[in-house]
Amino acid sequence: MRPSNREHDQLRPVTITRNFTNYAEGSVLVEFGQTKVICNASIVEGVPRFLKGKNQGWITAEYGMLPRATHSRTEREASKGKQGGRTLEIQRLIGRSLRACIDLKVLGENTITLDCDVIQADGGTRTAAITGSCVAMRDAIHWMVQREKIKKMPAFNYVAAVSVGIYRGQPVLDLDYAEDVLAETDMNVVMNEQGHFIEVQGTAEDNSFNREQLNSMLSLAEIGIPQLIEIQKNA
């Protein structure tokens, strides 16, 4: 039995609230159960130096957690003077995932920056950030079209992410914190609406996992992610 009494293939309740803040070109509050993340998409003119003159855009991300997003206060990384390895890894994952949504050439020499701020963490913050940021980014691109910064709305490929793992010997979908801390295996899966994989990150925590368990976890992701994409489209 899972701590939340969910079935092994059941997501937590997921909600996506668009236009959550007033100033960002795209803004979303995404909630996976008790995990809550604000995802703001900002349009910035210009691209990184390595893309100058190539007539294409860029998508990047920043990620952070509020000090009391967790059970006890965590010191802000800004006060330490540097970002931790986990933060950098998550930022890169979010950026890679969202660059799979569109052809970067349609953005011109503009950058979309996704700021993902975790206001409450109960497991799966990075997967929630990817899922919410996809919607915020689509709204930001629509803003660009309205202001004639680009000619038309480009083809957009929705991307979502979910965690899967082995909890007490059983593959489960969308781990919360109570499961995550005891999981024998923890994996994050990113997929698009065609059912293609964008990224798979998996780590054995206490015990190794076999091919059958890996297949079971990927099958759970294939159950959960289409549901998340449907929620994105209906937000």
From Swiss-Prot:
Signal peptide location: none
Species name: Legionella pneumophila subsp. pneumophila (strain Philadelphia 1 / ATCC 33152 / DSM 7513)
Pfam families in the record: RNase_PH, RNase_PH_C
The enzyme's E.C. designation: 2.7.7.56
Keyword annotations of the record: Nucleotidyltransferase, RNA-binding, rRNA processing, Transferase, tRNA processing, tRNA-binding
Presence of keyword tRNA-binding: yes
Name by which UniProt lists this protein: Ribonuclease PH
Reactions that this protein is recorded to catalyse: tRNA(n+1) + phosphate = tRNA(n) + a ribonucleoside 5'-diphosphate
Superkingdom of the organism of origin: Bacteria
Gene Ontology biological process terms, A to Z: rRNA catabolic process; rRNA processing; tRNA processing
Family as reported in the entry's similarity comment: Belongs to the RNase PH family.
Subunit structure: Homohexameric ring arranged as a trimer of dimers.
InterPro entries (UniProt xref): ExoRNase_PH_dom1 (IPR001247), ExoRNase_PH_dom2 (IPR015847), ExoRNase_PH_dom2_sf (IPR036345), PNPase/RNase_PH_dom_sf (IPR027408), Ribosomal_Su5_D2-typ_SF (IPR020568), RNase_PH (IPR050080), RNase_PH_bac-type (IPR002381), RNase_PH_CS (IPR018336)
Residues the entry annotates as binding phosphate: R86, G124, T125, R126
Reported function: Phosphorolytic 3'-5' exoribonuclease that plays an important role in tRNA 3'-end maturation. Removes nucleotide residues following the 3'-CCA terminus of tRNAs; can also add nucleotides to the ends of RNA molecules by using nucleoside diphosphates as substrates, but this may not be physiologically important. Probably plays a role in initiation of 16S rRNA degradation (leading to ribosome degradation) during starvation.
Molecular-function annotations in GO: 3'-5'-RNA exonuclease activity; tRNA binding; tRNA nucleotidyltransferase activity
